[in-house]
């Protein structure tokens, strides 16, 4: 039996969505409502055969969801709201409470709200989206899918920071990790393509986009990941610095009189590829500038690759070897130059890539003599969300082995 599942990612001024037929995974429609709260908000909807957009005032998220549901009916994508069997919502932070996706209840909503102090920019609006869909689709189960849940398998030495113990015990300061839904999806897809159980593999997954993270996966479980207490930490990103010497911050504060809020702005929005290159946070713009001889752009690309290489190396050491390296995300899936730079001179790990396969974005780009598989896999977080919805909200025994 096929079910219609809506996957939702609610942002501060946007609402991304996919309606999928499950368990087939067929996308019935997908799109975004952006500039919510403004008179010129934009709705974009795509199906397999057509695409349309509409510019219209959208006062708030409730109006956005109402507009979306009306469009689905008016365009005959669904006959009525009862056609939507369940909804799945990306939630940025599940803390230590949620080790898996969860059926939303009043208690679950209260806990997501409590955890908003760990993700003040994301959890409140994620919760808002959940609440609106629960009100407008009261008969459809709602599932919260947490970006942090996949990393709850980290052992304590991998997630504790060397700070006074009370900061963890009383305030919950620890490594949480993010991009978990993506890392979970692509590692499972890798095992499927190889015809090998994920439990038998040691994998490093590089989710590289405007936000980037690296994850070590052993036996199908996350054992380390580069993002930490916040998505700001780890490797260099589009506008985020990643890991730096923490004493730089009080030094800058004293030297330039910056407030904590200004320091946060510096680290999150003015650093990374943008900060070093002075060109753009967009990897394509930096690659073009580097090809045109811009030395700062060239340095930014080199630094980006070097930080990722160092992280890969530490994870290989932790896992005692490597069976496969995955590239995913906007940069990982599309930049042959980035993949080549990251894989350069890793022959000692049994890892080398075929230049032609890499240039043409083949699924497997390792050279014939390589011992380590190198895969380029398009992430699909919406499908992973829909699978979790099916597993938790609409369990059918015959499907559980497929969806596991």
Curated annotation (Swiss-Prot):
Pfam families: Acetate_kinase
A molecular-function term among this protein's GO annotations: acetate kinase activity
Task of the protein: Works with phosphate acetyltransferase (pta) to capture exogenous propionate and regenerate propionyl-CoA during degradation of 1,2-propanediol (1,2-PD).
Protein name in the entry: Propionate kinase
Organism lineage string: Bacteria, Pseudomonadati, Pseudomonadota, Gammaproteobacteria, Enterobacterales
Entry EC no(s): 2.7.2.15
InterPro entries from the UniProt entry: Ac/propionate_kinase, Aliphatic_acid_kin_short-chain, Aliphatic_acid_kinase_CS, ATPase_NBD, Propionate_kinase_PduW
Sequence similarity: Belongs to the acetokinase family. PduW subfamily.
Organism this protein belongs to: Escherichia fergusonii (strain ATCC 35469 / DSM 13698 / CCUG 18766 / IAM 14443 / JCM 21226 / LMG 7866 / NBRC 102419 / NCTC 12128 / CDC 0568-73)
Enzyme class of the recorded protein, top EC level: transferase
Taxonomic superkingdom: Bacteria
Reaction(s) catalysed by this chain's protein: propanoate + ATP = propanoyl phosphate + ADP
Keyword tags: ATP-binding, Cytoplasm, Kinase, Nucleotide-binding, Transferase
PROSITE patterns per record: ACETATE_KINASE_1, ACETATE_KINASE_2
HAMAP family registered for this protein in UniProt: Acetate_kinase (MF_00020), Propion_kin_subfam2 (MF_01882)
Pathway annotation from the record: Polyol metabolism; 1,2-propanediol degradation
GO terms under biological process: acetate metabolic process; propanediol catabolic process; propionate catabolic process
Cellular component GO terms, alphabetical: cytoplasm
Localization (cell): Cytoplasm
């Amino acid at each position: 039996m096929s079910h219609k599942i809506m996957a939702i990612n609610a942002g501060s001024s946007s609402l991304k969505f996919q309606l999928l037929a499950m368990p087939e995974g067929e996308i019935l429609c997908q799109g975004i409502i952006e500039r919510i709260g403004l008179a010129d908000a934009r709705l974009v909807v795509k199906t397999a055969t057509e695409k349309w957009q509409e510019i219209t005032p959208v006062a708030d998220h409730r109006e956005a969801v109402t507009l979306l549901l009306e469009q689905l009916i008016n365009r005959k994508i669904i006959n009525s709201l009862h056609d939507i069997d369940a909804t799945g919502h990306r939630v940025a932070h599940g803390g230590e409470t949620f080790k898996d996706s969860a059926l939303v209840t009043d208690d679950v909503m209260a806990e997501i709200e409590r955890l908003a102090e760990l993700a003040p920019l994301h959890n409140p609006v994620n919760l808002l989206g959940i609440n609106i869909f629960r009100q407008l689709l009261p008969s459809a189960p709602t599932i919260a899918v947490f970006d942090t849940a996949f990393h709850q398998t980290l052992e304590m030495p991998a997630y504790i920071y060397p700070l006074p113990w009370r900061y963890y015990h009383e305030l919950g300061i620890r490594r949480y990790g993010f991009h978990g839904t993506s890392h979970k999806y692509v590692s499972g897809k890798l095992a499927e393509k190889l015809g090998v159980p994920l439990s038998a593999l040691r994998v490093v997954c590089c989710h590289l986009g405007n936000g980037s993270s690296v994850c070590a996966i052993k036996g199908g479980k996350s054992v380390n990941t580069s993002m930490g207490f916040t998505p700001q930490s780890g490797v260099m990103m589009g506008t985020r610095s990643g890991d730096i010497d923490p004493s730089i911050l009080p030094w800058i504060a004293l030297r330039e009189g910056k407030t904590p809020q200004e320091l946060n702005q510096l680290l999150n929005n003015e650093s990374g590829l943008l900060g070093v290159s002075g060109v753009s946070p967009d990897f394509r713009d930096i690659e073009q500038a580097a090809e045109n001889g811009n030395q700062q752009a060239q340095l930014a690309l080199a630094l980006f690759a070097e930080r990722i290489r160092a992280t890969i190396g530490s994870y290989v050491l932790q896992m005692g070897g490597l069976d496969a390296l995955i590239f995913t995300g906007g940069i990982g899936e599309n930049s042959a130059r980035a993949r080549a730079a990251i894989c350069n001179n890793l022959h000692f790990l049994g890892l080398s890539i075929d230049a032609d396969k890499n240039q043409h974005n083949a699924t497997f780009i390792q050279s014939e003599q390589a011992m380590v598989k190198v895969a380029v896999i398009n992430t699909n977080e919406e499908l992973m969300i829909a699978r979790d919805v099916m597993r938790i909200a609409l369990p059918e025994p015959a499907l559980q082995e497929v969806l596991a």
